Amino acid sequence: MKNQKSCQQEALIFPEKRRVPSQIPTFNQPENAPMIHLKPEDLSIPDLQRTLQFAVGPRPIALASTIDRDGRVNLSPFSFFNVFSTNPPILIFSPANRGRDGSTKDTLHNVLAVPEVVIHSVSHAMVEQTSLSSTEYPTGVNEFLKAGFTPVESTLVHPPRVAEAPVAMECEVLEVKALGDG
């Protein structure tokens, strides 16, 4: 009986007025837990994003380095990232708008101006520094310096590589496609 009550409580984790990440369902629910039905139009954008991020996980993290027209470096992590094709090799990532104010991120501005990016895999040893690079600094602030990463000259593209990264993929941007409002 205790499990049934717990199951019912789990089913009510999305109250009407307030939703927080701790209220997103987990994969640890009992087998007989009722399915939670959500309509995207009923959720705020932040709640929808958290729900999608929970549902598609764990996700790899891409650490993307770009430069602007003036050669200023930007370094930013992205959890909406994956490999889409092998032949030709194609990576995708989504520099969604900032949650704070809906503005576009420097990474997007940079790849539109200089269509090159270095995508790095993030190791466990890099987690804290990667988190520091995710801070929303003003345009022009060098996240390599703020996070304590070592920039290394790339071989094929202009943005630098992260010396500490186990993998760095130097990429030319083939396409930037706007999807939705954020």
Predicted regions and their residues:
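Active-site-proximal mixed secondary-structure blocks
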Residues: 13-19, 24-76, 82-182
